[in-house]
């Protein structure tokens, strides 16, 4: 257990020092390395880490958070960075596909890379880190309880995410209209909220272990959106909310493929199989 914790800590530190912030720096393209070298990346099950070759983080651009870049509040264990940290992962002979990755609670911009590189081996991956830190873990917005969230903060972070991503797309000449957005848990929730608040941004999305987080929101025009939701049938806390999210997206006209797999809240091979089938 100590060894695993030590490895995870080193990888988290490596990701933090090799990433940059929206509108700053040029992330360095990276190469795919051996399976063994990719095993320490967090965010998915051990079985998938064993079988997936993953991009090496490489040298990249060092961007350390300064005190002036973090807003703190009187609340205990809460802070917010002023920028979103991001990193590109581009394999050799990359296709024109762009996959935007939003991690779950406690993750970072590298967390979903093993999963995504397995499904889209030639795509350019854009991993983004949520800028909220609460109770020692990274998040996309402030939570009140595990299933109740600060409504003002959800909207604040969704709007900030869209503004920053749009600016980055303009600078890097990225075509977001053909991008696939992949979110897990907290990241999937932020992505779903973003779709409701900014319906023109996301045209294709994968939402894993997600739930609706906005209490009152107008029905958005999602007629051009395709969405895959993946729920773990053993995910006792969050699976009961999945039908409500699918219904909300469908009410806006989105084409939703709602799937339930034999899994808990953690990700694994069945998620990769479901997504691969959906994108085929």
List the model feature ranges, each with a label.
Residues 182-187, 191:
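Gly/Ala-rich beta-loop-alpha elbow adjacent to hydrolase catalytic centers
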Residues 78-174:
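Serine-hydrolase catalytic machinery in alpha/beta-hydrolase-like enzymes
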Residues 25-98:
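A domain-start/cap signature at the N-terminus of enzymes
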Residues 233-239:
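Acidic catalytic loop of the alpha/beta-hydrolase fold
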Residues 174-183:
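Alpha/beta-hydrolase fold nucleophile elbow
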């Amino acid at each position: 257990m100590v060894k695993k914790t030590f490895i995870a800590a080193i990888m988290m530190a490596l990701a933090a020092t090799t990433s940059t912030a929206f509108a700053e720096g040029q992330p360095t393209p990276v190469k795919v390395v051996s399976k063994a070298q990719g095993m320490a990346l967090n965010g998915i099950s051990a079985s998938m880490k064993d079988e997936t070759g993953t991009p090496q983080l490489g040298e990249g651009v060092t961007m350390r958070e300064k005190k002036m870049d973090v807003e703190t509040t009187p609340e205990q264990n809460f802070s917010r960075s002023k920028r979103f940290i991001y990193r590109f992962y581009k394999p050799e002979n990359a296709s024109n596909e762009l996959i935007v990755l939003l991690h779950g609670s406690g993750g970072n911009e590298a967390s979903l890379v093993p999963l995504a590189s397995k499904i889209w081996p030639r795509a350019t991956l854009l991993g983004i880190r949520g800028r909220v830190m609460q109770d020692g873990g990274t998040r996309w917005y402030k939570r009140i309880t595990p299933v109740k969230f600060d409504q003002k903060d959800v909207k604040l972070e969704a709007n900030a995410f869209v503004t920053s991503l749009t600016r980055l797309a303009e600078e890097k000449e990225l075509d977001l209209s053909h991008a696939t957005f992949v979110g897990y848990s907290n990241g999937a929730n932020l992505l779903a909220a973003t779709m409701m608040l900014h319906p023109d941004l996301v045209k294709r999305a994968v939402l894993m272990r997600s739930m609706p987080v906005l209490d009152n929101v107008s029905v958005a025009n999602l007629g051009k959106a395709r969405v895959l939701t993946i729920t773990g049938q053993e995910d006792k806390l969050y699976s009961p909310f999945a039908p409500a999210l699918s219904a909300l997206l469908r009410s806006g006209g989105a084409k939703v493929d709602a799937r339930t797999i034999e899994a808990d809240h953690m990700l694994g091979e069945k998620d990769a199989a479901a997504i691969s089938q959906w994108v085929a």
